[in-house]
Amino acid sequence: MSRSALVENVMAMLEDAGFLVSDRCAIRPKSFDIAARRGEDVLLLKILGNIDAFDAQTGGEMRRLGTYLNATPIVIGLRTRDEELKPGVVYFRHGVPVLSPDTAMDLFVEEVPPLIYAAPGGLYVNIDSEILADVREDRDWSLGRLAKELGVSRRTVSKYEDGMDASVEVAAELEDLFDAPLTSPVSVLDGAEEVRDDEPTPDDPDVAPEDEPIVTVFTRIGFEVHPTDRAPFKSVNESDDEHGQVLAGHSAFTETAEKRARIMSSVGEVTRTRSVYVVDELRRESVEGTALIEKEEMENIEDAIDLRDLIMERGEDREEVA
């Protein structure tokens, strides 16, 4: 299956599952392919045939964007260089959960979360430590008795009851022994934080010199500016008050800039953010929901209210963002 067909299939699957799905980010470079929202769940998705193509720089940016936009970064892929991705298993690349299309279908359409995750050494599951301790005590088994049944040390059983995860084989044996479900699903929509390696999120990239005047304006009027490396927008700008978040782009108004502004509008609708594109010369007032503002005009903005009013006047006033 081509990557383009895979992206289209994932988009159709998400729409069938009730998600609002953004336009595809058909520009390069791009840290994510689509954004999607269902209720309060917001996803940023990268879709790949071979997940080994997902590099650390892209993973870091997706995790940063997930933080700024209250979204979960997820990769959906078919295989690694060595094997097909197994259904029902969560993999990880650079701190981002990775699912096969079948696993994504189960999670988003059937609402059946995966139980298994891959980590160095094999496949593992979350053991509900409280239930395990309860069923062992109900049977009046000591830690040593259970350890003997499993063929492991007493210390290992104690660790299971303290929250250590178990291999798939051990988990299956435990459930057979006690005839009870003892596993907990992987919370993919919360970033699978309980099982993924605790990798620190990389710092924001440096601001490009040509974008510094725009960053200065956002900072001066009270926004915290988060530059991006590979997103269709140059920065995510956060305000603690009612002005919320603004996606910002900046360049001459070319055909590529128009595509970026259109994608920003679509992503903004999904993530409930406004978007503005700063251009050298104003030829029109908006591209769909993205307001266009001339650079000199931007530099003369006095406060966040002025910016908000200008964006609302020129862009489409979407209720979801109000």
UniProtKB/Swiss-Prot annotation:
Keywords: DNA-binding, Transcription, Transcription regulation. SMART domains: HTH_XRE. Gene3D superfamilies: lambda repressor-like DNA-binding domains (1.10.260.40). Residues 132-189 form the HTH cro/C1-type domain. The keyword DNA-binding applies. Pfam families: HTH_3 (PF01381). Residues 143-162 bind DNA. It comes from the Archaea. One of its GO terms (molecular function) is DNA binding. SUPFAM superfamilies: lambda repressor-like DNA-binding domains (SSF47413). The keyword Disulfide bond does not apply. This is Putative HTH-type transcriptional regulatory protein rrnAC2519.
